[in-house]
Amino acid sequence: MATGQANKLTGAVGEFLVAAELCRRGLLATPFAGNVPVLHYDIIASGQSGGHVAVQVKAINRHAWQFDIRKFLDVHMDEDGKRQILGAPQQEPFPELMCVLVVLKKTGQDRFFILEWKQLQNLLVRAYTEYLSKYNFVRPRVPGSFHTALAISDVEPFEKKWAKILDRVPSTLMA
């Protein structure tokens, strides 16, 4: 299991790589240390002609990103504390929030998956619902766990889709 320091380094490297990639594409990108807690973003990218977009970054060294489904879906336990009851999707934490999922590799071989927060939410909620429905909404090992994971293969259609961000912010430079 990764240490707290290793997780912080992974996150920091991911944020700086995303900021650098956005700058290469003509945006002015500013990473924050960690994220802006209330607003849930890690980077603000601004166009040279105005406008900006908030970006949340999630980086990994291995095969899957880890999430708490409650950030994406209202979930609570039934009266006996075993069955999960799935409610409505959570509101987007920041308007038009973009997400960049990063797989850290050797220098120059990193992978970037760019999607809207709502697209990420849809992927996670659909997979979580399908998983729980197989077990009548009672998690087999730890009924009260809200953990979910997203494999690289789940987001491959979003790889290198930088235009999803670039199209939201006016820029005078070509990508």
Regions inferred by a protein language model and the residue ranges of each:
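Mixed-charge (Asp/Glu-Lys/Arg
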Residues: 1-39, 44-175
